[in-house]
Each structure stands twice: as structure tokens, then as C-alpha cells.
Curated annotation (Swiss-Prot):
The modification S-(dipyrrolylmethanemethyl)cysteine is found at residue 252. Its cofactor is dipyrromethane. The porphobilinogen subunits are added to the dipyrromethane group. Its EC number is 2.5.1.61. This is Porphobilinogen deaminase.
Amino acid sequence: MSRQPPIRIGARGSKLSLAQSGLMQARIAHALGVPAGASKDEIEAAAPLIPIVTSGDRIQDRRLMEIGGKGLFTKEIEEALLDGRIDCAVHSLKDMPAELPPGLVLAATPEREDPRDAFISHVCERLEDLPKGARLGTASLRRQAQALHVRPDLEIVMLRGNVDTRLAKLERGEADAILLAQSGLNRLGLGHLTRSWLDPDACPPAPGQGALVIETRAEDIGAPWLEAVRCRQTTIAVAAERGALLALEGSCRTAIGARAILDGARLSMIVEALTPDGAQRFRREGDITLTGADDIAEARAFGLTLGAEVRAAGGDAIILPE
């Protein structure tokens, strides 16, 4: 492939976001014609990283639901995309709202990392083994609800901040254990800190967890370099999960888990929503055989169906009051 004009990559300024964007930067540069084994300068020239500080990064002392939701991690980046200051953005898919601003699309999803939630503690090996009344640190309503469903005696400690900040709070004794995405730990070279994992069938992760996604302007979705970084299997699975997210009107005020697995043409899926206190859980699971006509649309429709069934069962009980 001949060299193309540079593709400017927008990314949050956090260590994890820059690590994730750096992983994609080399792949994008290669897709643009930069040879394997090229120097960092050559890669940077073809696909420069443009760090952008978001509102979600600046405000660290409150839950996302209190300050505007997931969109606070993407607002400034999406404005830069629409203004033409950057050409694409790399995000953690789990942080993306169910609906995007007009003119923007999720254009490519590469191979997924480990989607599980990691349990980290100096007290014990597993969530189930925590002492009665132990403090569990998380800012995720889903992780809170799933943990309380298993262990209603736990005290939930609000723990926002980047991965290093959360680990430091654990070291200082502000919590007895914390839950983090294993994918983020792996990308930061911290996977060895995990003591165990939440069972992804019993506690499905957030829709899209473990997957990165490249967001572009709608008119750029057919660019050849995007095709070079797409993973069909991941794209189909996350289409189902995000379909469920949309049906459940997912936000930071709803505790939603979804896990889809593609095996050949068979797509299986678990979707659940819980009340914020974990006392009630509404769950649906099933599988379909994809026809091959439009696998992504079929997967999304499957997710929408299961999500709608969970929404009908849970009603307003699954939404945290404002």
C-alpha cells in the first residue's frame, strides 16, 4: 500500500489511554504504508498522537453519573473530530455512550483483550472471601451492584481516578479490595497484580469491555486503512453487546452487564441489569445462528431483543434515581 497523508489520532491524556492509542498508532501507521520495524519517528510522522484532556479526566472526586456521564470522556475529543483537528480517536469501547453525536461513527474495532473484571486485594484471593463488612473500591455502578448481589454485607467505597491512583488508594488502605478491567491492567503491564477474576458468566462485564474502538467522521468510514485494523469476530460480538446497551438506555445510572461470544456462526449472549443495591437481578441469555447476510446487523438486533426483554422485566427499578 502506498503512503497516505498522516492520520492524526486523538486520545485522552491518561497513561492508559496513551498506551492504548500507542498500540493502535503502530497498526494504523503500518496500514498507511509504514513498513514493519520502522522507527518511532516514522510511525509518529504517519500517525501522530494528539493528547486531549477531557472533562472526565479533570473531575476526579465524583461519580460520572453526578457530573454528566460517560460523554465527559469523549466530548472534547469528538469536538476535535468534528472540527477537523484530528482524523480519528481511539477509545475504550466500554466508555462510549450508546448513541454518538451526528456525523461520527465507530468505524473499526480491533481484536479484543481480556474482557473480565480483575479482583485486586492484599486481604484475600477472591471477592467471595472478603471479610464481613469489608470495603470494596469502585466507581462503577455495575461492579457495585454485581458485588453486592454476591456479598450484600460489603461497604462500597467510591474510587475514581486512573489505574495508578486507584492502586495507590488500595495501598494506603482506603479499600480492602478493588475491581479493575483486566484489559487495562494488561495494556499497562500490570496484569500480574490480579488475584482472581469475576466469573464473566456470573458477572458479565460492561458492554464492549476489553475492546478498543476507532471513532471517525461518518464520511471516512470506508477508508482502506480502517479495514486493515478491523477484527470481524470482535466487531460482531460488541455489536450485540451495544445493541443491548441501547435497548436498556444504558448510562452511568444503570448497572448493565453484557457478554457475547461468537463461535463460528453461533452467537451466544448474556445480558443482565441489576438494581443499584444488587438486591434484584434481571437476566436473559440465548443464542442465534448468523445467516451471513449481514452479521453485524443481525448481532445488533439480537442484542436489542435481549436488552429489551431485560428492560421490560426490570422497569424503573434498574435506574438509579437522580
